[in-house]
């Protein structure tokens, strides 16, 4: 089982949204997934509850409470026994022994960020913290920045400047663009199953097209992430 961790010091950086999106992309490819909910607010647990009500949750995916060390250890042990392909961890903001343990146990680390000065500053701080932690533990774990909520059209001058600041860091080649489909995942459930349900409703054709474009974007990102995980 490979562990993919989403981490950022900043709340609202897009960790949970990125995890939900990649979860849908991996699941659509037949992967079995364990989700470690290490945020004390348990956003993944609420996501599953919403999805079950909408019939947009798959049996190939399970959410584990992991906001305490004992819960994390139990979750990891059970997920290994269940034979999941990937575990996706949603950390809480800031640094802690729990976050450090998750980071040090990972096969790949993703640091989501939006292209604003505050977000980029927090992403750089998170990246420095992660690298220093890995060096102190004599670990070499691939770490990359995932750009979030990038405009579909042209970037502003400020956004281009923020993007340029990331040039010296490993960055996932394809970003997640700003799309209603991504913003609505928390309420609608797994994107690929939401899309599947809409395909049977001719009145939802325009929305279905938007969801399909969003899903294609996630599949592209998931392939890049899978290559790094399996590499």
From Swiss-Prot:
Lineage top rank: taxon: Bacteria
Record keywords, A-Z: Crown gall tumor, Plasmid
Keyword Nucleus: no
InterPro entries (alphabetical): DNA_Partitioning_ATPase, P-loop_NTPase, VirC1
MF annotations from Gene Ontology: DNA binding
Family matches, as Gene3D superfamilies: P-loop containing nucleotide triphosphate hydrolases
Something else known: The Ti plasmid contains at least six transcriptional units, designated vir loci, which are essential for efficient crown-gall tumorigenesis.
NCBIfam families xrefs: PRK13849.1
Protein name from the UniProt record: Protein virC1
Organism: Agrobacterium fabrum (strain C58 / ATCC 33970)
């Amino acid at each position: 089982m490979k562990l993919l961790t989403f981490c950022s010091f900043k709340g609202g950086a897009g960790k949970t949204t990125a995890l939900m999106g990649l979860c849908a992309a991996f699941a659509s490819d037949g992967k079995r997934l364990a989700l470690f909910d290490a945020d004390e607010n348990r956003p993944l647990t609420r996501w599953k509850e919403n999805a079950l009500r909408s019939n947009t949750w798959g049996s190939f995916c399970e959410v584990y409470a992991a906001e305490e060390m004992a819960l994390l250890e139990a979750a990891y042990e059970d997920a290994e026994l269940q034979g999941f392909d990937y575990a996706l961890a949603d950390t809480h903001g800031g640094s802690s022994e729990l976050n450090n343990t998750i980071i040090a146990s990972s096969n790949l680390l993703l640091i989501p960020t939006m292209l604003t000065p505050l977000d980029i500053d927090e992403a750089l701080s998170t990246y420095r913290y992660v690298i220093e932690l890995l060096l102190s533990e004599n670990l070499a774990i691939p770490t990359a920045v995932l750009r979030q909520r990038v405009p579909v059209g042209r970037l502003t001058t400020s956004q281009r400047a923020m993007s340029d600041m990331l040039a010296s860091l490993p960055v996932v080649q394809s970003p997640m663009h700003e799309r209603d489909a991504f913003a609505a995942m928390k309420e609608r459930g797994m994107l690929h199953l939401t899309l599947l349900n809409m395909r049977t409703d001719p009145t939802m054709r325009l929305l279905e097209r938007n969801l399909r474009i969003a899903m294609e974007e996630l599949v592209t990102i998931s392939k890049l992430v899978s290559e790094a995980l399996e590499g």
